[in-house]
A protein has these predicted regions:
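Metallo-beta-lactamase
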Residues: 64, 76-90, 94-106, 124-182, 232-245, ...
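Residue-level marker for buried hydrophobic side chains located in beta-strands
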Residues: 56-58, 99, 130, 202-204, ...
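Conserved beta-strand hairpin/beta-sheet module of binuclear metal-dependent hydrolase folds
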Residues: 10-88, 192-207
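Active-site metal-binding loops of divalent metal-dependent hydrolases
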Residues: 8-10, 60-63, 103, 135-136, ...
Length: 276
């Protein structure tokens, strides 16, 4: 099994939004910001290949279809994910599975592409099954007031219309050694892939734990729709990660891609930085 991280680009998010009730005097010691309180966030994708009959992509960034509507976020260094895959010897048509942790624009925007001449929107990965949780899909179609601006129907409609959408209701095995587990809090039923290799499990933590600075369970983003649930789900993830020595992959951390975590008394902390 080959695991490769692809950074699809970066954007700015307000530090107060990212760290919620945590005061800047505390969070600024863990994560830098600019003069307007903007924190640079990555949009991280994970490519899993050399799996029998599978080429798996986890999340795919914001794409380019909605950059004008999202100009507030000041995107920069965006890459064409299809070109990045070609550099790794994989054409988009070879991707068999696209796992979407959730359907906020910064995680699924490259799921579809737009023909600028005809206006047609079509799946970026024409032969792939797109994995989404059922509750997340329902929330995407009928969003709550706090999430509606994070969803764009153009990112997913062509996938559903083309019969490429696979909805899951419970923890599911995608294939041997890759499990898809469901976590609530940030948004309904976020998918978190657990990738088991000999001697090591990698956890694509999504927005359950988006940054190494967010490892402390109380450090909950204001973007989390259900903060008490977020706390409980973070503890659930962290207890196992600390006990089993799992590697967390942080989808938004521009400075730390992966690390293990440790539990010291009743506190969780980032432990060893890991390179993939």
């Amino acid at each position: 099994m080959d695991i490769q991280i692809i950074d699809t680009g970066y954007f700015y998010a307000d530090g107060g939004a990212m760290f919620g009730a945590i005061p800047k005097t505390a969070w600024s010691r863990r994560y830098p910001s600019n003069e307007t309180n903007g924190c640079v966030l990555a949009m991280r994708s994970l490519l899993v290949s050399n799996v029998p009959e599978k080429v798996i992509l986890i999340d795919n960034g914001a794409g380019t279809k909605h950059l004008r509507q999202l100009s507030y976020y000041n995107f920069f260094d965006l890459v064409d994910l299809g070109e990045e895959l070609h550099k790794r010897g994989i054409s988009p048509g070879l991707v068999t599975d696209v796992v979407l942790t959730h359907l906020h624009f910064d995680h699924c925007g490259y799921s579809t592409l737009k023909n600028e001449e005809t206006g047609e929107i079509y799946p970026a990965f024409p032969n792939a099954t797109y994995w989404v949780s059922r509750k997340q899909w329902d929330n995407f179609l009928h969003p709550n007031a706090l999430e509606k601006d994070s969803y764009f129907i153009e990112n997913m409609k062509a996938i559903a219309d083309n019969g490429q959408l696979r909805l899951i209701d419970t923890d599911t095995e995608l294939c041997p050694d890759i499990d898809l587990r469901l976590f609530d809090g940030h948004t309904p039923e976020q998918i978190v892939p657990y990738i088991h290799t000999p001697g090591q499990t990698f956890v694509f933590a999504g927005d359950v734990i988006p940054l190494a600075a967010s490892v402390s369970p109380e450090w909950i983003s204001a973007y989390d729709t259900f903060p008490v649930t977020s706390y409980q789900e973070k503890v659930r993830m962290l207890e196992e990660a600390a006990r089993e020595g799992q590697v967390l992959i942080y989808c938004h951390d521009a400075y730390t891609r992966c690390s293990t975590v440790k539990k010291v008394n009743d506190f969780f902390k980032k432990d060893k930085t890991i390179e993939i």
